[in-house]
Regions:
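Bacterial Sec-dependent N-terminal signal peptides
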Residues: 1-23
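Solvent-exposed loop/turn segments at secondary-structure junctions
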Residues: 75-78, 113-116, 166-170, 234-239, ...
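Active-site neighborhood of glycoside hydrolase catalytic domains
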Residues: 208-229, 233-335
Length: 472
């Protein structure tokens, strides 16, 4: 009889549902307190009587996240040189380390000068060198390449993609790196190019430029850096005084289909070609290229920035199979403010809701007010004071960390709905649900968040970023 009782008791324990309290991990940031671990929140069973501000649907997966990153620029490397070796390593670790930093895994770099180079240069400034006899990355070997290798200490599998701001000036109609005059360049008014194509649309020049870009990829490979993708023109619609180049949609379609694509294939480069980085929101311009079978044979995806945010959702709906990437975060004006961080959250949510698989910040590190070589003060994730050597992690650093730290490459964005809109949800490879929120209000806000058959209630602080982590 006693033995029968024990068997019955064991059977009861095996069939009885397990009851335990599951908690939600909570990290928050305000302007006064950054990256603070709050007390865990209890996850409760959902009821029909409870109203919910947001509902998360873990089984409804959207795009897979390829990663997060920023851009390697010359002035960023110069800012790091202000620090001693130990402090410099700490900064790099806080950007790239997967356990302690932002876990950057997919980053950008320029091909030749951009507006955060020390000054103008290209990789072949010898006029008429169609065979690229004088092509050289010697300057990069002193600045950008060491910068990248230092980062790879903390992220060995770091993926790099690249884009030119301007071709060599001898390939351009006005023989200048810029298309618009300004107080920081020597372009004459009569040489401005304010519409049309700034690149010479001649077969010799187009062929040479395709070789120029392919040699860039090959040269970097020899220095131990694999460039997995090239976006062949930064902002082909921009008008400004720093390095740039105007292209019309038909000209872009032509160079991709007849020159870049065939050249990369002939050289057996595994590097992808992307249509980017696009700063335009007119669908007809996209259609010219994305509806071309000849160009689409070579295009791996579309990169968007600035005005691109206005069309990304429409573009994603129309071209559902085309991969999308956000390629440059909006840069501010060197204020390094909490408001800038809130704008960053807005941009990240906007692009992620539009289907991008990667998000790229602009300057990772800058000195002082973040002044470019062409006179524009801009923000960075990390600010270094040259005089005091003080390192400041800006509000945008923490806004970015609320996304990237718990959402590594391989995570999936998942569906969410409800009246509370300042929210993005992911499922990471560790089986964790990650919910990132922003409270823009000047007062605290209570939120009920439902996850399948459970929910939790939380009151988030005014002007705060919050990340909630639930083990599923």
């Amino acid at each position: 009889m006693k033995r029968q009782f024990k068997i019955c008791a064991l059977y009861f324990l095996l069939i009885r549902p397990a009851t335990f309290t599951q908690n939600v991990r909570w990290i928050r940031s305000t302007e006064q307190e950054r990256w603070v671990s709050n007390n865990p929140i209890e996850l409760k069973n959902a009821t029909a009587a409870t109203s919910y501000d947001a509902e998360i649907y873990p089984t409804q997966k959207q795009q897979t996240i390829d990663g997060w990153g920023g851009c390697f620029n010359e002035l960023g490397w110069d800012a790091l040189q202000v620090l001693d070796a130990k402090d410099r390593e700490t900064v790099l670790k806080t950007l790239f380390d997967p356990k302690e930093g932002l876990n950057f895994t997919i980053c950008r770099m320029p091909i030749g000068a951009n507006d955060y180079a020390r000054n103008w240069y290209s990789l072949d400034d010898s006029a008429g060198d169609f065979k690229m006899k004088y092509f050289s990355i010697d300057r990069d070997r002193k600045i950008l390449i060491p910068y990248i290798h230092e980062a790879k200490k903390y992220q060995p599998a770091l993926k790099l993609w690249a884009s030119p701001w301007s071709p060599p000036v001898w390939m351009k109609t006005n023989k200048h790196y810029a298309n618009k005059r300004g107080d920081h360049n020597d372009l004459k008014p009569e040489n401005e190019v304010l519409s049309g194509n700034q690149f010479i649309q001649d077969e010799n020049y187009l062929s040479a430029y395709a070789v120029y870009l392919s040699k860039f990829v090959e040269a970097y490979q020899k220095d131990g850096i694999n460039v997995y993708a090239v976006h062949f023109q930064n902002e082909p619609y921009t008008l400004n005084q720093w390095p740039n180049c105007l292209w019309t949609p038909s000209a872009m379609c032509n160079i991709i289909a007849r020159y870049l694509g065939p050249t990369f294939r002939k050289e057996q480069l595994k590097t992808e070609l992307w249509l980017g980085t696009w700063n335009n929101d007119v669908m007809a311009n996209f259609d010219t290229i994305l509806s071309s079978p000849e160009a689409m044979k070579y295009i791996a995806g579309v990169g968007l920035q600035w005005e691109g945010k206005n069309i990304i959702q429409e573009l994603h709906k129309k071209y559902t199979t085309v991969k999308l990437m956000q390629t440059e975060s909006e840069c501010g004006n060197g204020d390094f403010s909490w408001k800038d961080a809130e704008h960053l959250f807005f941009l990240m949510k906007k692009y992620l809701d539009g289907g991008v698989t990667a998000y790229t910040y602009w300057n990772m590190v800058l000195a002082d007010k973040g002044t470019s070589s062409w006179g524009w003060n801009q923000n960075a994730l990390i600010q270094i004071d040259k005089a005091s050597r003080k390192v400041t992690y800006t509000p945008e650093y923490y806004a970015f960390k609320h996304f990237s730290y718990f959402v590594p490459a391989g995570s999936s964005k998942i569906e969410s709905a409800g009246s509370f809109k300042e929210l993005v949800a992911f499922l990471n490879p560790h089986g964790e649900l990650v919910i990132v929120t922003n409270n823009l209000q000047d007062t605290a806000k209570a939120i009920n968040i439902k996850i399948s058959a459970q929910y939790f209630t939380v009151t988030v602080q005014p002007k705060s970023f919050n990340t909630f982590i639930v083990k599923l």
